[in-house]
Amino acid sequence: MTSIFQLTLFALILFSFVLVVGVPVVFALPNGWTENKRIVLSGLGLWILLVFVVGILNSFVV
């Protein structure tokens, strides 16, 4: 269970870094938001899901 938690936490950290870099790039493009709105919102949804999964797995590890 600990390894699953660690992999999920690593995925959350990696995906957070991708969003921190990617979202400002999307907003900086001339038509970035209108063209990539679905990708940004999907990424946000996946990030929220990862936060909840890490929280649930944390209760089993500790």
UniProtKB/Swiss-Prot annotation:
CC terms in the record's Gene Ontology section: chloroplast thylakoid membrane; photosystem II reaction center
Origin: domain of life: Eukaryota
Pfam families: Ycf9 (PF01737)
Main localization of the protein described in the UniProt heading: plastid
Keywords: Chloroplast, Membrane, Photosynthesis, Photosystem II, Plastid, Reaction center, Thylakoid, Transmembrane, Transmembrane helix
Record field: transmembrane: 8-28, 41-61
Gene Ontology biological process terms in this record: photosynthesis; photosystem II stabilization
Description of how the protein assembles with itself and partners: PSII is composed of 1 copy each of membrane proteins PsbA, PsbB, PsbC, PsbD, PsbE, PsbF, PsbH, PsbI, PsbJ, PsbK, PsbL, PsbM, PsbT, PsbY, PsbZ, Psb30/Ycf12, at least 3 peripheral proteins of the oxygen-evolving complex and a large number of cofactors. It forms dimeric complexes.
Protein family according to the UniProt entry: Belongs to the PsbZ family.
The protein's name: Photosystem II reaction center protein Z
Organism per entry: Stigeoclonium helveticum
Gene name as annotated: psbZ
